[in-house]
Swiss-Prot record:
Catalyzes the dehydration of L-rhamnonate to 2-keto-3-deoxy-L-rhamnonate (KDR). Its cofactor is Mg(2+). It comes from Azorhizobium caulinodans (strain ATCC 43989 / DSM 5975 / JCM 20966 / LMG 6465 / NBRC 14845 / NCIMB 13405 / ORS 571). CDD domains: MR_like_2 (cd03327). The record marks E339 as: Transition state stabilizer. This is L-rhamnonate dehydratase. GO terms for molecular function: L-rhamnonate dehydratase activity; magnesium ion binding. Its EC number is 4.2.1.90.
């Protein structure tokens, strides 16, 4: 059987909920008063939309093979990412065999080194890479996780990220993660409020339910150490997540060293590539790494990242990303559970992360999920969502 080549790659954008989960209306819990690197400025403290967290929007990448098979994926990137796909990366994709994913990844990454390496460019490469895996699996009429070695467990179990861990417990999740509301610039009063919120939630969920805190790069080492110590000793906080800016490897190493025994330090949501994660691992920055498969380099790179972590004895619990992480986590021994982002505006319902952009997107039931054998990542684009193609080549 001859292997098809790639006829065309296309990049689309769409606004609203979908690949860029930040792109929500102001009443959504994800746009509440949440600590961020911009919290030092009062004008940008109340809402993440005020400093532009939603400016990029969603990127949808389609790759069509010479036999008519189409793979697609969604990630964050919007029009700037669409331009990169159409004007730069397309030359490495079109005409290539659909099986040559490793070659295409290497060419995309090397060709963008002078203006890429992380951030938007690697988001874009990730989107293309995921679309290529979707295409290959559809051509083979298999789910992506079969191509990655097959499932090592019967089902996935999840913790929930959202504003209401107490509701997550009722829904059967193994734990709940909340966003931190106040950063160092809000002083002792802000610290007390953070601890009061956590203590209130601990009283609601009981002592045995996992509680975690997402700090979204907002803290410094001193504040993070103090918060983590009190939160662990008094409220049994399981982990402190992404406390520091992602480039502060030295700070993370100090935080992990200073954290109380038994409390976990986690990070990696905004890290990218095997080289970035190698820094985290070599410097012993954390107990769990949390790469986002739509931002770190795609499946192709996540395979390498996870191998490094496995050799270092560090767990891998990918950040969100729905089916794109589910198909990976189910195949890895050092990924014992997964994250589910509660994307309902008031997180009292389990809804698909990429709603309404994707159809057939599975969600956990009682905190658990079995993957089926639908080819590719098992999802379809919703034809009612208006995609636009701002650039062509």
């Amino acid at each position: 059987m001859s292997v098809p080549t790639i006829r065309e790659v296309r990049a689309y954008v769409v606004r609203g909920g979908g690949g860029d989960y930040h792109d929500q209306q102001g009443t959504h819990w994800i746009d509440d008063h949440i600590a961020t690197p911009m919290s030092k400025y009062p004008a940008y403290r109340q809402s993440r939309r005020t400093f532009g967290i939603n400016v990029l929007g969603t990127l949808v990448v389609e790759v069509e093979a010479s036999d008519g098979t189409v793979g697609f994926a969604v990630t964050t990137g919007g029009e700037p990412a669409a331009w990169i796909v159409e004007k730069h990366l397309a030359r490495f994709i079109e005409g290539a065999k659909i099986t040559d994913i490793e070659l295409m990844w290497d060419q995309m990454y090397r060709s963008t080194l002078y203006y890429g390496r992380k951030g938007l460019v690697v988001n874009t490469i990730s989107g293309v890479d995921l679309a290529l895996w979707d295409l290959l699996a559809k051509w083979r009429k298999e789910p992506v996780y079969h191509l990655l070695g097959g499932a090592v467990r019967d089902e996935l179990q999840f913790y929930a990220t959202g504003a209401r861990p107490d509701l997550a417990k009722e829904m059967g999740f193994i734990g709940g993660k909340m966003a931190l509301h106040h950063g160092p610039a809000e002083g002792e009063e802000g610290l007390r409020k953070n601890l009061d919120i956590l203590n209130d939630m601990r009283n609601k969920v009981g002592k045995d339910f996992w509680l975690m805190q997402d700090c979204w790069m907002a803290l410094d080492v001193e504040y993070a150490t103090r918060f983590s110590t009190i939160a662990w000793n008094e409220m049994g906080l399981k982990w402190t997540e992404e406390a520091l800016p992602p480039d502060d490897y030295w700070g993370y190493a100090a935080l992990k060293k200073n954290a109380p025994k038994g409390h976990l330090i986690t990070t990696g949501e905004h890290e990218a590539t095997r080289w970035g994660f190698k820094m985290l691992l070599d410097m012993e920055c954390c107990d769990i790494i949390q790469p986002d498969v739509g931002w770190c380099g795609g499946i192709t790179e996540l395979i390498k990242i996870t191998a490094l972590a496995d050799a270092a004895g560090v767990l891998v619990v990918p950040h969100g990303s729905s089916v794109y992480s589910y198909h990976f986590v189910i195949t890895r021994h050092n990924s014992p559970f997964a994250e589910f982002l509660m994307m309902h505006p008031v997180p009292d319902q389990v809804v698909p992360m990429f709603t309404p952009l994707l159809l057939d997107e599975p969600v956990p039931v009682n905190g658990r999920l079995k993957l089926d054998d639908t080819p590719g990542f098992g999802v379809r684009l919703n034809p009612e969502c208006k995609l636009s193609r701002p650039y062509t080549h």
